[in-house]
Amino acid sequence: MELAALAKTRLMSMTEASCIFCKIVSREINTEFIAETNNTLAFRDIAPLANVHLLVIPKQHHRDVVELANNAPEILSEVLRTATDLAKKFTAGSFKLQFNTGAEAGQTVFHAHAHVLSDSAKDGS
């Protein structure tokens, strides 16, 4: 293996090893899941910015939604389906579906994830 490729692989492994969402996927961090598919997990945000604030993540590590779209569009599609299903279940109808890409855009966890946000929660959710 070429030195540059080896360095990139090692950096990627270290990033994944320290990624909080990867630790959630591997069950190293105990989290209450509200949905799980073959390729996604969903849970409530620990610092909600709305009455409903859910996160949907791919189980596979991708730094952001652009990397996910380029490398695994079928998994991105599953993230979107899961987010939409959860919005129907937990919101009264209107919601935001948001991806932050890059620190300047507000991304704080560098593992692709969708935010489902709504101020109108469905009764009982």
Q: Where would I find each of the regions flagged by the language model?
A:
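HIT superfamily nucleotide-processing domains
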Residues: E2-S125
